[in-house]
């Protein structure tokens, strides 16, 4: 996993992502496709990362085909639902919705996507490595989560976390418990669609100061629509909205 990695592509410049949504329809992009792992890119990564531990380098040489196989299995399961999800994406793209309503629909779709893909991913074992990297979300989603878990989110004006992108096992999510995510049913959209399509968690294990490619499922459509329905709101890390996790003041 790369040190600066977080579950938002382009999160340093959300306005750029938003403008991209305005130019591109996304209704046909729901089907999972690897972000990396095609055309031998993982083989190339293995050669370029000679400084990584030997087991990681060896895995990089096989991760692409393994992940592609898992994606194919997922696609078979996903096919009957693709048209409905594509229709929802088109609706959210074309029609005006109240922000909260649109975000609820998108989060529900992300949960469905996650439930279908997880059995074919390394995430089926809920390894928790990604619970130690920045997780970006909007103020609107923070409010939705806060309402669901009955915790009042703070309102960060600037996100030091998303600028500095600290990561490591010394930076756990405030909702992480010894048994896993303490708000799993309410977790951010970014967490729902962040799926390693390899066979196990080896490439997700955090190595200080080292970048490790991970064959992620393609959730670009979710990210793009998220920026549209939240109207380009600034993003902040989950730790900045909920620094004390479930120990924060209960919302009214």
Model-derived features: positions:
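Short loop/turn segments that flank or connect secondary-structure elements
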Residues: 2-129, 133-180, 184-252
